[in-house]
Amino acid sequence: MAELPFKNTYDLSPEQLLALDEAEEMMERLDLGAAEAAFLAMLEEAPGCIPVLNNLGHLYGKMLSEFEKAVEYYEKVLQQEPDNAWARDQRRRYLRYCSYD
């Protein structure tokens, strides 16, 4: 396999990297239902996959305005990586939105 243009921090397989890339492209094209289904399918195969959890948090929070779900996924990231600043900041943002009536 060719050298990746980034560090594969989570040691994802080539298949996982491809699936993640495809799901992210779906999200960029605003094919949100397909992106959600793809991310959830990846999560079934690898329940603790940080990149998938982060993407689901982003999808639910920013794209679908389902703030409670976004918070749930960012909390799952923080259970594994308590120092993950991105997940902590996003969780804080969406928790504020959850408190608005």
Predicted regions and their residues:
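Residue-level recognition of tetratricopeptide repeat
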Residues: E24, H58-L59, R93
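Structural signature of tandem alpha-helical TPR/SEL1-like repeats
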Residues: A2, E28-A41, L64-K76, Y97-D101
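Alpha-helical segment of the N-proximal tetratricopeptide repeat
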Residues: S13-E45
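TPR-adjacent "capping" and linker segments in tetratricopeptide-repeat scaffold/adaptor proteins
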Residues: A2-L18
